């Protein structure tokens, strides 16, 4: 399984969360607090770093 983040909140060093509309993909193994719940740690090409994504801003894709 993988997760497709369509609109996600990138929690970084900035005080205000950034809303990103580009698609970022992550594996289900990136889940930290249960599948489809909590936050995902995903690599972002745009940020060129690992970032936290909230699960309620994504949908799960069956592989």
Where are the model-predicted features located?
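Structured surface patches comprising rigid loops and adjacent beta-strands/short helices at the edges
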Residues: 54-62
């Amino acid at each position: 399984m993988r997760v497709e983040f369509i609109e996600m909140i990138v929690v970084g060093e900035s005080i205000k969360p950034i809303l990103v509309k580009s698609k970022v993909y992550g594996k289900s193994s990136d889940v930290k607090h249960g599948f489809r719940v909590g936050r995902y740690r995903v690599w972002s090409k745009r940020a060129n770093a690992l970032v936290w994504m909230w699960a309620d801003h994504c949908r799960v894709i069956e592989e």
